[in-house]
Curated annotation (Swiss-Prot):
Identification of the protein by name: Ribosomal RNA small subunit methyltransferase H
Natural source organism: Neisseria meningitidis serogroup C (strain 053442)
The enzyme's E.C. designation: 2.1.1.199
Protein function: Specifically methylates the N4 position of cytidine in position 1402 (C1402) of 16S rRNA.
Alphabetical list of NCBIfam families matching this protein: 16S rRNA (cytosine(1402)-N(4))-methyltransferase RsmH (TIGR00006)
Keywords: Cytoplasm, Methyltransferase, rRNA processing, S-adenosyl-L-methionine, Transferase
Domain of life: Bacteria
One Pfam family from the record: Methyltransf_5
Location(s) in or outside the cell: Cytoplasm
Major subcellular site: cytoplasm
Amino acid sequence: MSGAESYRHITVLLNEAVDALAVREDGVYVDGTFGRGGHSRLILSRLGDAGRLIVFDKDPQAIAVAEELARSDKRVGVVHGGFASFQTALDGLGIGKVDGALFDLGISSPQIDDGSRGFSFRFDAPLDMRMDTMRGMSAAEWIAVASEQDLHEVIKNYGEERFSRQIARAIVAQRAESPIDTTRKLAQIVAQNVRTRERGQDPATRTFQAIRIFINRELEEVGAVLPQVMCRLKEGGRLAVIAFHSLEDRIVKQFVKKYSQHAPLPRWAAVREADLPEPPLKIAGRALKPGEAEIAANPRARSAVLRVAERTAGPIPEQSQRKTSEWQ
């Protein structure tokens, strides 16, 4: 077992998320965030021999686990890449419509707890933060070249950090003297420039979150995949998304709301709302959060929110049927 595999990972809202998919034995399902396979294995336990599960992940360590699972279970297909390539990947696998798709957003416990990955300020490690360590620019590389304004905007917009301007200014000043290439160096700069601290939260939390989200294009990928899933779901198919912070959850909530209701008609409209075709989605139950027992067993579950939508027979608006290349 590799170092990364030794880290304990507890799947959040495991039963609730898979129950929300209403898995059919012969269905085709997508786990857009395989991680260590908690949701995937439960989906597989409910699929019959004719069922199929396609799993996505950027993380090479997660992909190694997924490929091992695929070798022992021919119902599993593996995609090494971000879920924003949803339609392209399904096309490549010869898959048309699907019965359900699940996304467990954000960072996984093994990624946080593996100090070498550079996601956590709890370890002194190279400042990487990439979910796919074989592609793209690391956090240290970006910090070395980003303008003060770009640093400020990323930390403010993705971390909702009040002291973003002071932190950005300090980063630029420090990097002129020596590279900011470890998690400890960045955490120390942030701590020196956050004047008030939130109870129970390290001052570096928001800045690390912001840079991680930016480096991995997390919010862009969420916004890109949702319309693709809507286009690929069969009638009655389910979309289930677990979000861990307000920025992700807002994107999901607004998307589902937009496509589960009609836009208000002007007073002079010649048609009534009752005469319009039904919206392409409907909200399937209320948003769910972990119960007290789950939070006690896994404190990282505290902020999780599960939202579920179901595909109807309603037509999808033309602007949501863009070419896949426009989403990537």
